[in-house]
């Protein structure tokens, strides 16, 4: 089922995006 793979890929993309946003926020807080 190809649709299942696409769904997993989308979930992985969402997770990566959320982690990226959190990483950005942490860097902003640590900036002088």
UniProtKB/Swiss-Prot annotation:
BP GO terms, sorted: oxygen transport
Tissue specificity remark: Hemolymph.
Keyword Heme attributed: no
GO molecular function annotation: oxygen carrier activity
Keyword tags: Copper, Oxygen transport, Secreted, Transport
Subcellular location: Secreted, Extracellular space
GO cellular component: extracellular region
Role description: Hemocyanins are copper-containing oxygen carriers occurring freely dissolved in the hemolymph of many mollusks and arthropods.
Family of the protein in this entry: Belongs to the tyrosinase family. Hemocyanin subfamily.
Name of the protein this chain belongs to: Hemocyanin C chain
Species whose genome carries this gene: Cherax destructor (Common yabby crayfish)
Organism classification: Eukaryota, Metazoa, Ecdysozoa, Arthropoda, Crustacea
């Amino acid at each position: 089922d190809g649709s299942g793979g696409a769904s997993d890929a989308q979930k992985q993309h969402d997770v990566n995006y959320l982690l990226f946003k959190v990483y950005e926020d942490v860097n902003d807080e640590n900036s002088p």
